[in-house]
Amino acid sequence: LRRLFRFLKANFQAFGRHWSVYVLLVVSINLVLTSLIVPGLTWGVNRLLVVNGIGYLTYTNFVSVLTKHPLVLISLVLLVLLICGLVYIQMAFLFRQIKRIQEQTPASQWQLLKQSGHDLLTLKPLTMLIMIGYFLLILPFGQIIFKSVLLNKVTIPAFIIQDMWTTPKIWGPIILVYTLALILSIRLITFLPETIFNKKLSTTRLLQKCWQTTRGRFWRLLIKVGVLAIAITLVGVLSQLLFFNLQRYYDQNLPHYALLLAILNLFILEIISQILLAMSIVMILQLILKQAGYLVPSETRVKVILKQRSLRIRMRQGAAMLLLILVAAGVALYDYAYLEGAMDNRPALISHRGVDDGNGVQNTIPALQKTAREKPDYIEMDIQETKDHQFVVMHDNNLEELAGVNRTVHELTLA
């Protein structure tokens, strides 16, 4: 436990030395991604589907798109490759920035961005294929290591994963996939920095080096990554609980100032969340760089810089605080408008499975007749196909809970 506390203390201190630069780095990247890159990609996909007369794209109509619109599928594959390339540039830029900040080496943002783009272009073909597989198959299941709004666009949706867990027959394969992804994400944790800082190695030798670097250290690395994630999450949860209870006190004892204090609480929470986001990304990537042997900060230089408290450092801290305040202020304005009802639009009323406040059995005509009196805008029903290609209105895939029959709907006939 002492080692873990020392490990946490060292990481928090390392982040604290340069917190302003890290916050500027992470918040700026996220602003660019969420404001420009992701909307641009979303618009491109939507436009592609509209032009080709495709209303939506899910696993249910994937085969149809594959056979009837092969060019659309090719375009989507190219889009996925583009996203993987952008994720690589993002990570290369972050790795290079963290290394530069820790080692206090001079380099402009533009230089590092160009180097990150060059890192992608100089990847060997086989290394690039492995990198794509790493992003698509390993990182989505090991998001404790790295999260990106870009990767969220090419991962399996959460509702599909949840639906898979409802089928006990495939629990084994799911657990196996998660276990393998976790093992590979730790054993190949140095894969990305090796591709960035050690381009001379062949793909085979690079993988061997990654495997050797983490040999005998799997549990140690897993515990370190887990401890960092838990510690940061705990800080976030405690801060939310603190402000939640403060707001409850304000609502009960200071009702005239409750709205103003709610905006202030949300403002502070947004600043905390942005700092914790930067902390989680930087600490994990810093750990990876150290494990790969590409991060050797000079303690002497750090101490000199801390003593000098140069104008440049103070300017960066000011810029970081200004950016945090602007982001938090934008969120606070939105929260104010929301809490005051300025953004209220009449929401669409949707009856879930045709019922209203438990007024009948889900997906049944009697319940629908009662629900219709409330005049909802939409009614959501669950329709499934039987073995003899008939349709039944039913939610559960399996009849065991309703009828005591451990069979799925598509295994039985309507008769």
Feature names for model-found ranges:
Residues 1-347:
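Hydrophobic alpha-helical membrane segments
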